[in-house]
């Protein structure tokens, strides 16, 4: 077993693989059990699957919580039981000739921001201790509570393609969204807002945790690289796991506090002269010093010292102006 590996892999998940399949295969390739993924992709979905290896698996919760970018395709004219191209058709509503690109664009813009979304029946969301897809496979449809998600952007990226014979309209899109977003449900809801049935006919994740589709590597290639002894050349540093969090650069005094799990109070640093190093920032996070804590709008921040991730801090749930360690990594 190789338990010394540590870092993040940008894996290209191919169609037909579950996210767990990828993890299981990598455990064999890398000969280590300490592997986990940073956000599930459905089997038919391709693209970026961030993988944490070694000690970086302690950061999986932040990887999973990070926003994601997807590119895909919506087909308007019929819906399926799984809301994607794999499911059986359940409703057909041939599209009329008067549906315009401007109507579609206007409808898409109304989904941007904080919205409520009901998770699909074919999903791993648990209700009463049972996954929704288990109910669905048993022919049951149950009530699901709506969940709040955030859509940062949702735009059409191609002209609409008319299939007048079948009454179908297809177009490509790009969406940047928060954790917990079901993009196939977004496609269904978009079509419904236009007065038609619809589904997501194609999807690829193009970015996650600062990792991009152009740099993603297939499992077969990772196996070749591992066999050649050059895996370190494709391992990203652990800080990519927290690329969605603001970065706070610590001074030596503050680092000594963080490494032993001490809390930070904003009031303690308002008059300090900061000399924290910020010479390198690979993930292009917005940088702060402890004097800037009052400017943060997030519940957590990533603490760095000499360009190394040392801890993740979170707002104290009961004490105003106090930040406590959520995870110490040194």
Curated annotation (Swiss-Prot):
Stored InterPro entries: PsdUridine_synth_cat_dom_sf, PsdUridine_synth_N, tRNA_psdUridine_synth_TruB, TruB_C
Purpose of the protein: Responsible for synthesis of pseudouridine from uracil-55 in the psi GC loop of transfer RNAs.
Catalytic activity of the protein: uridine(55) in tRNA = pseudouridine(55) in tRNA
Keyword presence, Plastid: no
CDD domains: PseudoU_synth_EcTruB (cd02573)
Keywords on record: Isomerase, tRNA processing
Location of the active site: 42
Keyword Isomerase part of the UniProt annotation: yes
Name of the top EC class for this enzyme: isomerase
EC code: 5.4.99.25
Family affiliation: Belongs to the pseudouridine synthase TruB family. Type 1 subfamily.
Superkingdom: Bacteria
GO molecular function, one term: RNA binding
Protein name (Swiss-Prot/TrEMBL): tRNA pseudouridine synthase B
GO process annotations (BP): mRNA pseudouridine synthesis; tRNA pseudouridine synthesis
Database matches in SUPFAM superfamilies: Pseudouridine synthase (SSF55120)
């Amino acid at each position: 077993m190789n338990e010394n590996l540590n870092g993040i892999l940008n894996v290209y998940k191919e169609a037909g693989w579950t996210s767990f399949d990828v993890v299981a295969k990598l455990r064999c390739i890398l000969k280590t059990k300490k592997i986990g993924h940073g956000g599930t992709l459905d089997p038919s979905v391709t693209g970026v699957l961030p993988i944490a290896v070694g000690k970086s698996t302690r950061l999986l919760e932040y990887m999973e919580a990070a926003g994601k970018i997807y590119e895909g395709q919506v087909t308007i004219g019929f819906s399926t039981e799984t809301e994607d191209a794999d499911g059986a058709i359940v409703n057909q509503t041939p599209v009329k000739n008067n549906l315009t690109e401007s109507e579609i664009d206007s409808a898409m813009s109304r989904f941007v921001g904080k919205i409520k979304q009901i998770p699909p029946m074919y999903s791993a969301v648990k209700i009463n201790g049972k996954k929704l897809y288990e109910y669905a496979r048993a022919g049951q449809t149950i009530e699901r509570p709506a969940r709040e998600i955030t859509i940062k952007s949702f735009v059409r990226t191609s002209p609409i393609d008319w299939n007048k014979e079948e009454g179908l309209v297809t177009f490509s899109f790009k969406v940047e969204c928060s954790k917990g977003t079901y993009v196939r449900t977004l496609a269904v809801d978009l079509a419904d807002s236009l007065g038609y049935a619809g589904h997501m006919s194609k999807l690829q994740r193009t970015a996650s945790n600062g990792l991009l589709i152009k740099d993603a590597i297939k499992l077969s290639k990772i196996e070749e690289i591992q066999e050649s002894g050059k895996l370190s050349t494709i391992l990203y540093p652990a800080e990519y796991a927290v690329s969605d969090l603001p970065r706070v650069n610590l001074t030596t005094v503050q680092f000594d506090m963080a490494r032993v799990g001490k809390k930070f109070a904003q009031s303690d640093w308002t008059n300090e002269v900061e000399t924290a190093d910020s010479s390198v920032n690979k993930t292009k996070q917005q940088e702060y010093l402890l004097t800037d804590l009052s400017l943060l709008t997030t519940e957590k921040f990533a603490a760095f010292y000499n360009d190394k991730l040392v801890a993740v801090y979170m707002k104290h749930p009961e004490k105003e102006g106090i930040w406590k360690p959520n995870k110490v990594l040194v």
